[in-house]
Amino acid sequence: MKKHLNAVLATITACLILLNISCNKAKSAEANTIAAAVKKDSVTVAKPEPGSIIDTADYNRRMIALSNNDTTGRWPVKTPYPLPGAILPYHRIIAFYGNLYSKRMGILGEIPKAEMLKKLDGEVKKWQAADTSTIAIPALHYIATTAQGAPGKDGKHRMRLAHRQIDTVISWARPIKALVFLDIQVGHSTVKEEVPTLEKYLMMPDVHLGIDPEFSLKNGHVPGTKIGTMDATDINDAINYLQKIVRDNKLPPKVLVVHRFTQGMVTNYKNIKICPEVQVVMDMDGFGDKILKKSTYLTYIKREPVQFTGFKLFYKNDIRKDPNGMYTPEELLKLIPKPIYIQFQ
């Protein structure tokens, strides 16, 4: 009986061993199957479309490069990451500024179209050669609403120019893949009142906005007799409007250029809203010799950081006293931080 029991136990043990081996093989086979499936899925899973995500490491690297070894701790500014499709800091914008109704307001409108576009292309190439790490792209920065000495019928001291000229500028820009900026001088009006008049254009992905505090005369002075001012609340009115347009129309981020060359032109800069939908450029807008322009940039742009910086060059006023008075790309790239938006007037 004992021998018989031992034989049964031996048989059961052998069966259990075989069963364990079989189970392990099954688990191993299952694991291999899962691994193969995972490997297969990792190959066949749909990748995001180009531009549907942002490479934050690349963005950070570019922002650090723009800060140009700043030691003050102000740059780069800590802001939310932009939405995919952002222009900055991946590109440097080279813009020609002006108005088609006047030859005195800038290079855009001062000389014939073909000559102007050729000159713009030359400036873009100079910047591309000076900084090969950042793609230089052209832009036409058109003054769509101009401040006026006369009050006009509504007493707002501003003139909204005909949209057909905006259409013309856009028709010039698109064949050369240039951006378009529409600039607003509010006079005695407000940003909140004026920006919506350009909505149909701002809904276009290649059209952006500029606002000029110099011609915002809240105190009642006639534009051109005093330098105006905008508070962060005024600038935020533009940002909020652009943010909504981007969200509602699923657009890439808009660029907002804010001109500045005095302390009083922008107040409460720390309260300027930065959001993923809008990229803010504070543009050094003053003319004069190199020492004056650099001082203006360092005092009002570098010292009061918002997000990105710009620098305006004047073909005539900058060289009035010195034929070599206009900054070169190489010289401007030594500034801290480096400007990412360059405007010619």
Predicted regions and their residues:
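Active-site beta-loop-alpha junctions enriched in small/polar residues
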Residues: 99-101, 143-147, 185-187, 214-216, ...
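C-terminal motif of bacterial Sec signal peptides marking the signal peptidase cleavage site
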Residues: 19-22
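Aromatic-lined carbohydrate-recognition surfaces of secreted/lumenal glycan-active proteins
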Residues: 186-191, 247-265
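Substrate-binding surface in catalytic domains of secreted glycosidases
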Residues: 213-251
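Bacterial N-terminal signal peptides that target proteins for export
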Residues: 2-10
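Acidic, His- and aromatic-enriched active-site or binding-groove loops in soluble protein domains
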Residues: 163, 202-213, 232-235, 277-292
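Alpha/beta catalytic barrel-like cores
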Residues: 24-159, 274-278, 292-345
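Substrate-binding cleft of extracellular glycoside hydrolase catalytic domains
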Residues: 126-128, 135-214
